[in-house]
Amino acid sequence: MKHSLRTLWRLRVKINEFNEYIKEARSFDIDRMHGMRQRMRIAMALTVLFGLMTIALALAVAALTPLKTVEPFVIRVDNSTGIIETVSALKETPNDYDEAITRYFASKYVRAREGFQLSEAEHNFRLVSLLSSPEEQSRFAKWYAGNNPESPQNIYQNMIATVTIKSISFLSKDLIQVRYYKTVRELNDKENISHWVSILNFSYINAQISTQDRLINPLGFQVSEYRSDPEVIQ
């Protein structure tokens, strides 16, 4: 009898130990699952946070992109004179187009007035006259006349004077400065280069002119005063 009771007591002890083991195992599994859930919540929160930061960064870059533009340009160097010129693109604004048109007419005017080639003399004289006011036409005609010793007809005769524009600057809305150099090629092919600065007072007028003249000066560009002086190169 005592032996049976002892055996039963030992069996009960083992069952209790087994139950404690099961309880501890379940508690461990529950704690582990709870920890995994916490880590998953933290990982999901970090994922959402990084996602929001990425979206915010992309929006910031997209907002700043229009403010930062790359404008390519070309630098051109004249091999004979060493003059450096920047070739830029034309921007799509009305003021830039207006200035570009004025620069075109100013350079055309200076080339025709200061350059000389006997075969083009008549054409250039007419062009300068069409782009000048009546008062400036009169001054130009007197200066260009054959009885004036300073006339390009008497100075250059059979030589060729070529004008190369270096820069064009707006001093005011109706005053423009043209820097250029003049290359005079003599009959023996010797070349002389001199540097000059021209100042032009200009405006655009709506004058009644012929269809042929309108082809030369379609917008009514007109120079009212003109002067050209040697430029001192240091």
Swiss-Prot record:
InterPro entries named among the record's database cross-references? NTF2-like_dom_sf, VirB8, VirB8/PtlE
The residue ranges crossing the membrane are 42-62
Cytoplasmic-side stretches of the chain, per the record, are 1-41
Gene Ontology biological process terms, A to Z: protein secretion by the type IV secretion system
Q: Where in the cell is it found?
A: Cell inner membrane
The record's section on SUPFAM superfamilies has: NTF2-like (SSF54427)
**Chief location:** membrane
Q: How does it sit in the membrane?
A: Single-pass membrane protein
Q: Which GO terms describe its cellular component?
A: plasma membrane
Give residue spans on the Periplasmic membrane side: 63-234
Pfam hit, one:
VirB8
- Subunit relationships: Interacts with virB9 and virB10.
Family of the protein in this entry: Belongs to the virB8 family.
Q: What is the name of the protein in this document? A: Type IV secretion system protein virB8
Gene designation? virB8
